[in-house]
Amino acid sequence: FQSNGISYPYQGFDEILAVGVKRIFSPNEKDRFEALSAFHQNKWLFGYLGYDLKNDTEKLSSNNADHVLFPEISFFEPQHLLFFKGNEIEIWSEEDVLEQIDKTESDLTQSKLNQPQASINKAEYIGIIEKLRQHIEDGDCYEINFCQEFHGEIENVNPIQLYSDLNKLSPSPFSCFQKHHEHYILSA
């Protein structure tokens, strides 16, 4: 988690690097929030909640194409925690990780992003926007948040460098990089 030094009215969070996996939580059963609560055990957990979990909490459903194939919920308990506070680093670990950090080699691979594909074409997008604009004009709503997914392939991906580049382009107070098996979440 990285705050990029951006102040936030409610303090935000420390910059934290969570490394390694002691335990992973990725359930398939229906009562996932209760299972997550039992898994927590007052330990540090990092992860995410997917958009479609709304269907578990309310009588809602969506039939969106899933191009990323992430589980709807996943959390892990890290082996090592590194807290960055100004010019200091505090390490919480059950083992000495400094030697491992010193031996780590940098990956200097440059990523090549192929042309991303929109989940809907331009004509459909314009049609949806016109319908949403009409709802606003009719007074049905005063604000609408419309999103569309873009997906694509990245060759020779260096996800850490890509995250760093995105973060430099658009720093935010709640930036995050997460690896989930062979998938990555870059939230910058």
Where are these regions (language model features)?
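Extended alpha-helical targeting/anchoring segments
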Residues: 1-188
